[in-house]
């Protein structure tokens, strides 16, 4: 029996064993061009764990399941993001994420001390993903009341928000040390399948990159009598084609290599390419797709080219070649987009401004969540909407004042945005003095403020790529029209400059003191360690005598 035949039989045996156990694994890649010169690639790796096999790990990562089970987590969302998503130009991603690290989770109703479990959960995930989640404490954790709602099959609970905790670390940097443990959670790790395309050298050179882990419970049947655990690992990348210096793209240009086939343990391995823009900017896919899928969803028509990747070990390279290089491109803004920036001057008072633009022809209700750290105190009395202290646009509000070094400031507003309008939210803050131990490294660079969260039920699916709540794989969006489309979006981050002491002064004093000590040490050391002896001096010798003495030495 040949080696290839033996490997094939072992692979078939493992796949049949996994199918008996009930676990399934899917890997998908979605490629979508952005006008005028960007390309969005979205990876998702879905592992569905049967409730009967949840105690054993066949395809699911045991380390992650142990954390979810030990700390009694019903739903978990964790992302690490570098860069800023441009909602006005690019629309909405499949999973939106705030810059830096973001973590929020719902705990089961049996958990009484949620804060204690929350700290243990963040510490465990910090070690698993080599991130700084151990810095999550009570002073940077909030409990959202309206902005975040679970996406899993949770039992009805009126106090579901009391089991929720949310925290973000906007200063967190995403690096290779985070990607490596993330890939080790996959069944094929980085040796086979779509994860082989995730080259850290290529990923971290993109305009925007985000990795995430999302765990939730979903219904395995229509009546939800059976529940499966869904573990979804995602990677979102946005490439600037101007840097590549070509509108033509391929796997080799984007990821540095081709696709070495599908993961042998995957039930399905599919590549979707959005070719909707092919009507205005013609391009040709190489090789041609196996099939073309047309989708009508919420007033938006989308066309996808589908590739089914097989686990045969053959290298696969998909690319696009554009025809006209100077084609006219027009981008349509999404129904809602926003902007956020800092006001003020000096080191005493300032303000945070959030602009909400409703580009749709009907009113849209949104929830705005502002999360200010304890060192940036905001007051509800300073809130102004379109320059006015009172406004009919606010339907409901929730405000939790912060406490110095103990809890952050938390503000949520339920608003109704008028059609074709721009709504401006302004809230003032004060600058405070910190203890010198509380300043981060390079304090003069500034202090990062986390993103605001914008939650809305969109009336249209224009520029909307998120999956339905009941869907796991990407094919669930095909013709998935709904009365509304939930969107949880993040604004851009902000940075403020707090009053910072002159940390260079101690450095200068130390340098001066060390210099003085060094200059004084040499002479003092010589005086204390050397013996001073008088050197006898004779009569002075003239130059003529020195020459004569020299000749005498030569004669001798």
PLM feature spans:
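Cleavable N-terminal signal peptides of Sec/SRP-targeted secreted and luminal proteins
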Residues: 3-22
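Long, solvent-exposed N-terminal ectodomains/accessory regions
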Residues: 18-242
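Serine/threonine-enriched low-complexity regions used as flexible
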Residues: 103-105, 110-149, 154, 247, ...
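Low-complexity, intrinsically disordered segments enriched in Ser/Thr together with acidic residues
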Residues: 117, 207, 211, 234-239, ...
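Edge strands and adjacent loops of beta-rich recognition modules
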Residues: 306-351
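Short, hydrophobic/aromatic-enriched beta-strand segments in well-ordered soluble domains
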Residues: 318-322, 338-339, 368, 423-433
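Short beta-strand elements of extracellular/lumenal beta-sandwich folds
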Residues: 343-371
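A surface/secretory-pathway sequence property marking extracellular, secreted
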Residues: 375-419, 423-432, 469-471
């Amino acid at each position: 029996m040949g080696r290839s035949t033996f490997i094939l039989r072992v692979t078939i045996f493992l796949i049949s064993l996994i199918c008996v156990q009930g676990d399934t694994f899917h890997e998908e890649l979605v490629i979508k061009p952005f006008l005028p010169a960007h390309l969005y690639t979205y990876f998702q790796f879905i592992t569905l764990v049967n409730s009967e096999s949840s105690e054993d790990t066949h395809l699911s990562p045991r380390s992650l399941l142990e954390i979810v089970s030990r700390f009694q987590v019903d739903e978990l969302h964790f992302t690490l993001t570098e860069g800023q998503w441009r909602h006005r130009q690019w629309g909405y991603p499949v999973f939106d994420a705030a810059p830096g690290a973001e973590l929020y989770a719902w705990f089961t109703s049996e958990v009484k001390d949620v804060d204690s479990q929350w700290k243990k959960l963040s510490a465990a995930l910090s070690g698993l993903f080599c991130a700084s989640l151990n810095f999550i404490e009570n002073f940077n954790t909030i409990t959202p009341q309206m902005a975040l709602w679970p996406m899993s099959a949770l039992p009805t609970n009126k106090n579901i928000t009391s089991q929720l905790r949310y925290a973000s670390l906007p200063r967190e940097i995403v690096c290779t040390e985070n990607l490596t443990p993330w890939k080790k959670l996959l069944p094929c790790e980085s040796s086979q399948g779509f994860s082989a395309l995730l080259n850290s050298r290529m990923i971290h050179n993109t305009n925007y990159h985000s990795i995430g882990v999302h765990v939730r419970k979903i219904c395995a049947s229509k009546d939800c009598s059976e529940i499966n655990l869904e573990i979804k690992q995602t990677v979102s990348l946005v490439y600037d084609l101007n840097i590549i210096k070509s509108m033509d793209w391929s796997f080799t240009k984007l990821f540095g290599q081709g696709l070495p086939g599908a993961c042998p343990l995957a039930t399905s391995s599919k590549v979707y390419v959005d070719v909707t823009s092919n009507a205005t900017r013609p391009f040709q896919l190489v090789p041609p797709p196996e099939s073309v899928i047309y989708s009508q969803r919420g007033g938006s028509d989308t066309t996808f080219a589908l590739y089914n990747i097989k686990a045969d070990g053959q290298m696969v390279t998909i690319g696009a070649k554009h025809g006209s290089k100077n084609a006219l491109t027009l981008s349509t803004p999404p129904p809602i987009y926003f902007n956020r920036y800092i006001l003020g001057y000096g080191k005493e008072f300032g303000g945070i401004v959030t602009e909400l633009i409703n580009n749709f022809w009907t009113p849209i209700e949104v929830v705005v969540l502002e999360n200010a750290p304890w060192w940036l105190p905001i007051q509800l009395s300073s809130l102004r909407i379109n320059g006015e202290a009172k406004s009919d646009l606010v339907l409901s509000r929730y405000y939790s004042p912060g406490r110095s070094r103990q809890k952050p400031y938390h503000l949520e507003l339920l608003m109704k945005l008028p059609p074709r309008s721009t709504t401006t939210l302004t809230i003032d803050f004060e600058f405070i003095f910190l203890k010198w131990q509380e300043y981060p490294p390079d304090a003069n660079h500034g202090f990062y403020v986390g993103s605001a969260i914008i939650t809305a039920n969109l009336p249209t699916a224009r520029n909307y790529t998120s999956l339905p709540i009941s869907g796991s794989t990407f094919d669930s969006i095909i013709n998935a029209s709904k009365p509304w489309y939930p969107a949880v979006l993040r604004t851009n981050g902000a940075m403020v400059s707090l009053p910072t002491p002159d940390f260079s002064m101690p450095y200068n004093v130390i340098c001066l003191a060390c210099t003085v000590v060094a200059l004084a040490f040499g002479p003092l050391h010589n005086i204390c360690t050397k013996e001073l002896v008088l050197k006898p001096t004779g009569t002075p010798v003239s130059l003529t005598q020195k020459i004569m003495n020299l000749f005498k030495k030569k004669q001798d």
